[in-house]
Design a protein with these regions (language model features):
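A short, surface-exposed interaction/processing loop segment used at functional sites
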Residues: 24-42, 160-189
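Proteins synthesized as precursors that undergo proteolytic processing into mature forms
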Residues: 96-129, 242-250
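A contiguous strand-loop segment
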Residues: 3-94, 127
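Structured loops at beta-to-helix junctions and adjacent beta-edge loops in soluble globular domains
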Residues: 18, 79, 144-146, 155-156, ...
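C-terminus-biased signal that marks the final domain/tail of proteins
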Residues: 1-14, 136-137, 146, 170-251
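Aromatic- and glycine-enriched pocket-lining scaffold segments that form the walls
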Residues: 113, 117-153
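Short acidic-glycine loop/turn motifs at beta-strand connectors
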Residues: 8-11, 70-72, 145-148, 154-159
Length: 251
């Protein structure tokens, strides 16, 4: 289970994710310095303009990032997207990037979401495994920059899609437009006590604080997590310093 959030507090922006699995892949913090030359399967080798740091495993001296941010504040997290995810054969005239190359391909060269959106117009996510042992993972990506702007990138049977992300969160399935549409089912949820519209004029006993969240999903499934984290992020207080902001983020 994966959940990723872009949290803003006092003109600072915090980016991260969790990876709740019962196994470990041996991932650990990995720094890739400026001028490191990335080798691409279908593109010329290219040196990194920007350093990056994130969680990765390293195979054959190549960092396979789960998520990372570069020195200019651009961050990307890859989350499980099993089912809708679809990668493609090589396409002539496109920049054919394998999914495991996407994070370094973008973080090594770009600094803003606007630049990434422009670069993705010419990208085809090509179905090439890293190795026989390391097969491709079905992923979609949350990307955000230091302004707090964020997008979601999904490769499905209908092509590569780039969505502006007004709620600045991402979980897993279904496809991002479906996750946004589902939020309408919970639009009456509020952090305040509800107004009695059931039987107006009757003095109902609001027996507990938090009744405005009574129908907030509590499941660990991806659709429930999306609703819950979108609500919590939207109503989280801003920290009055960096420590309190980081604490709020982890909550």
């Amino acid at each position: 289970m994966c959940t990723s959030i872009v949290y803003s507090s006092n003109n600072h922006h915090y980016f991260g994710r969790n990876l709740d699995l019962e196994i470990s892949f041996g991932e650990h913090p990995v720094i890739t310095p400026r001028n490191y030359e990335f080798q691409y399967r279908k593109l010329p080798n290219k040196k990194a303009k920007y350093a990056m740091v994130g969680m990765a495993i390293v195979e054959d001296n190549y960092p396979l990032y789960f998520d990372a941010s570069n020195e200019e504040g651009l961050g990307i997290a890859g989350l499980n997207f099993d089912g809708p995810c679809h990668y493609f054969p090589e396409v002539s005239g496109k920049n054919n990037v394998t999914p495991f190359e996407l994070i370094p391909y973008l973080l090594s060269q770009y600094t803003t979401v606007a630049e990434v959106k422009e670069a993705l117009k010419s990208v085809n996510l090509v179905k090439i495994n890293f190795s026989e042992k390391l097969q491709l993972s079905p992923l979609h990506w949350l990307m955000a920059d230091k302004t707090g702007e964020s997008i979601v990138v999904e490769s499905t049977l209908s092509g590569l899609h780039v969505y502006d992300n007004p709620v600045h969160v991402l979980t897993n399935n279904p496809e991002f437009p479906g996750q946004l549409s589902n939020l309408a089912n919970y639009s009456n949820i509020a952090p305040s006590q509800p107004k009695n519209t059931l039987v107006p004029g009757v003095d109902l006993n609001l027996y507990s604080r938090g009744l405005g969240t009574h129908f907030l999903p509590g499941g660990m499934d991806s659709a429930s997590r999306f609703v819950k984290v979108a609500f919590v992020r939207a109503h989280s207080p801003q920290g009055n310093n960096e420590l309190s902001s980081v604490t709020n983020y982890f909550h």
